[in-house]
Amino acid sequence: RSLLDISVSIGGRFVQEQRSAIYSRIDRGSTVRISDVAVLPKADALLELSERVISSFTVQIYSGEEVLLSREYDLELMAFDQWLGTQILPQCLASFVVPNQPAVGRMVVKASALLKQMTGASAFVEYQDGDPNTVVEQVSAIFAALHQEGIIYRAVPASYEAIGQRITLADQVLESYQGNCIELTLLMASVLEAVGINSGVVIMRGHAFLGVWLSEVCYRQSICDDASFLEKACSDGIS
């Protein structure tokens, strides 16, 4: 039989409630693509998550106000600080580089004072003078500033690079004075980005560390699994 006044709704604890436009008639055997509803998260609810949660959302098909069909779909949600590792969207690691945090800004100020002691100039000019040594001096000042914080190193979880881990953000690392290799790497990357210096996070089995571009270039893609690329970039005469 033909269906009259058809609409679709979607909603759940972590999914925004939506309802499609009404289709006055859908003939038997015909197909209709409904594009004005989507699985959209409730951002505020997601930010409140502190642990992994298994939830669901419901899709219902109406004829007028009569429910013709109701289906529930499982939804696995992670806390906002969960990184899923290198096997699932590894490029999402970049979202944990947070150059605009106030704590990162304070580290820039501290590093600026150290840079003045080292070079006589306190300004972070990133790549403006075209001299790789200037970049090295700026990176050294930032490293020295972070080193003076006395942050304690703690080990990463086993196989973290494959299965991921909870990431302590830069401000929390500075507040708690502790972090593992990936968190310290992201902290350093955050401060570098705040002053305009390009960096890259290198992930190895059981470890992570930072690489810095000494000239104003960067890799065109967000991820690279070719070790020879790094080897060539680190060769003598290449910045």
Name every feature range the model reports, one short phrase each.
Residues 41, 49, 54, 70-75, ...:
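Mixed-charge (Asp/Glu-Lys/Arg
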Residues 38, 71-73, 93-118:
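Structured catalytic cores of large enzymes
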Residues 4-56, 60-69:
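Intrinsically disordered, low-complexity Pro/Gly/Ser/Thr-rich segments with frequent PxxP/GP/PP motifs
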Residues 104-176:
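Secondary-structure boundary elements
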Residues 65-100:
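Short beta-strand elements
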Residues 179-239:
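Hydrophobic/aromatic-rich core segments of domains that either
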